[in-house]
Amino acid sequence: MCADHGISSVLSLMQLVSSNFPVGSFAYSRGLEWAVENNWVNSVETFYSWQQQWIDGPLIYLEWPMLKRCYYYAQIRDEMNFFQCALRILSYRDTHELRLEERQRGKALSRIILQWYPFTDGGTWLSALEHSGLASIAWLGYTWSISLENLALGYAYNMLESATMAGLKLVPFGQITAQRLLRSLMERLPNDWKKSDMIADHELGNGFLLQSIASSCHETQYSRLFRS
């Protein structure tokens, strides 16, 4: 029974981080497209540095800590604090495009969730899921019995894979280079998760100013492939 349960959670995680599932989503570059257009990112090395800055800032100090908090509130069935967490995540998305992306991912995931788990206890849970893709991932992760650490690492992998595929088109570089970059970025994630697990509320924050600037400027970029 335990082995079957473990296999089921692994398969559920694989579904959740699949590129066909609306989690990281390949429609978004999160400012990378503008950074490439304006020569901030113009090589494999500068692309790698851009992703490292995302890990060292938003991932460790915002994405993972808020995922952890949402997971906890889903676990204890505290819908009001879960809802507040979803709103807080949205408030940290400091550009129009990043907020729009968060909502779009939330609405896409909530539509899928509703097909499997029709809510009968009011609209607070559903409203929270619609507000935030990250909150929706936390809710599904708990519901599917995926451990928090595996969920966090899977989420980070999905986001880095999406970014690498965007970089492959924009920088550009080849498939072999893309896989090498992704592998190198993945190797640091377990230790980074341990650091993120200790982040207190007063330490939460985005911490990637260049991405915020690039995302803001991308709103008016004339020719673009990505929504953000």
UniProtKB/Swiss-Prot annotation:
One of its GO terms (cellular component) is cytoplasm. It comes from the Bacteria. InterPro entries: UreF, UreF_sf. Keywords: Chaperone, Cytoplasm, Nickel insertion. GO terms for molecular function: nickel cation binding. Pfam families: UreF. UreD, UreF and UreG form a complex that acts as a GTP-hydrolysis-dependent molecular chaperone, activating the urease apoprotein by helping to assemble the nickel containing metallocenter of UreC. The UreE protein probably delivers the nickel. HAMAP family: UreF. Required for maturation of urease via the functional incorporation of the urease nickel metallocenter. This is Urease accessory protein UreF. The gene is ureF.
